[in-house]
Amino acid sequence: MFEQEAWQPSAPIKTLFTRAKIIREIRKFFTERGLLEVETPVLSEFGVTDVHLSTFNTEFIAPIGENSKTLWLMTSPEYHMKRLLAAGSGAIFQICRVFRNEEAGSRHNPEFTMLEWYRPHFDMYRLINEVDDLLQQILDCEPAESFSYQFVFQQYVGLDPLSAPRAELVAKAREHHFMCDENEERDTLLEFLFSTVVEPQIGQTRPAVIYHFPASQAALAQISSEDHRVAERFEFYFKGLELANGFNELTDANEQLIRFERDNRQREKMGLPQRAIDKRLLAALEAGMPNCAGVALGVDRLLMAALNANRIEEVMAFGVNNA
């Protein structure tokens, strides 16, 4: 009667044992270093303003006499974890499910597992070293190679991403079959060229960390005090996968508000719905979040790298197509 239903798990049971073992190793790594494991909400009154992130929402049916309200599934535990930091939690980590309303593919599932941690009084470079330590322990790999965004972009694209005229970026993007006009957003061109030309060249045999992304791509990172053209942001790549994205975290509430408002203006320009700004995060920053560095790492992609898997559902009990 039901024999046509695809009920079997996406990943072999043997893989799920390996997954559990690696998650235990991750917890041990941080516990031994004195970090507090925390849990934060999956649902929030606030989504995210980031134009690159699409969120799921649901309707909370309030008791009679109270107003129902829209709640958002979290794309990251970042905002809640920063509120804990402002409250004096000290160094913290979390392994949790997060949700992004994006297409499913070989490297993407709309529901996935994220490892996120924050280190008060660490700078970007010290946190890069800790990410590298974790990867070496979990993947038994060589230490990561380290390159600035500007260096690898010049190396493989042949243009300086911080100073090249827009017309040159447009011409180079068209060489790689990107359909764009002369007024294409500069960041769109940079992101296309980086993902299409640079990413396939890095982190193939050992992890690679790229740091100092353009200031226009700072997100929630501080701008470098040494070069205002770049942000104190880094990403790790290995075996064709983006594994981790980290920042020297922005602590200025007013600057964060400016960036959120800029996101919403860009959303309006792109025909996307604007999002309510998380004022609780801004209040926490204003109250005094300590200087810190933080990073988010995709656990499923880490497992893909560990097991040489080609598709993300190969390391999950159930992918979106048979959930």
Curated annotation (Swiss-Prot):
InterPro entries named in the record: Aa-tRNA-synt_II, aa-tRNA-synth_II, aa-tRNA-synth_II/BPL/LPL, EpmA, Lys-tRNA-synth_II_C
Alphabetic keyword roster: ATP-binding, Ligase, Nucleotide-binding
Reactions performed catalytically: D-beta-lysine + L-lysyl-[protein] + ATP = N(6)-((3R)-3,6-diaminohexanoyl)-L-lysyl-[protein] + AMP + diphosphate + H(+)
Alphabetical list of Pfam families matching this protein: tRNA-synt_2
Matches recorded under PROSITE patterns: AA_TRNA_LIGASE_II (PS50862)
One biological process term in Gene Ontology: lysyl-tRNA aminoacylation
Positions with a binding annotation for substrate: 76-78, 118, 249
Record's GO cellular component terms: cytosol
One GO MF term attached to the UniProt entry: tRNA binding
Keyword Nucleotide-binding assigned: yes
Signal peptide (residue range): none
Oligomer status and interactors: Homodimer.
HAMAP family: EF_P_modif_A
Function description: With EpmB is involved in the beta-lysylation step of the post-translational modification of translation elongation factor P (EF-P). Catalyzes the ATP-dependent activation of (R)-beta-lysine produced by EpmB, forming a lysyl-adenylate, from which the beta-lysyl moiety is then transferred to the epsilon-amino group of a conserved specific lysine residue in EF-P.
Family listed: Belongs to the class-II aminoacyl-tRNA synthetase family. EpmA subfamily.
Protein name: Elongation factor P--(R)-beta-lysine ligase
Underlying gene: epmA
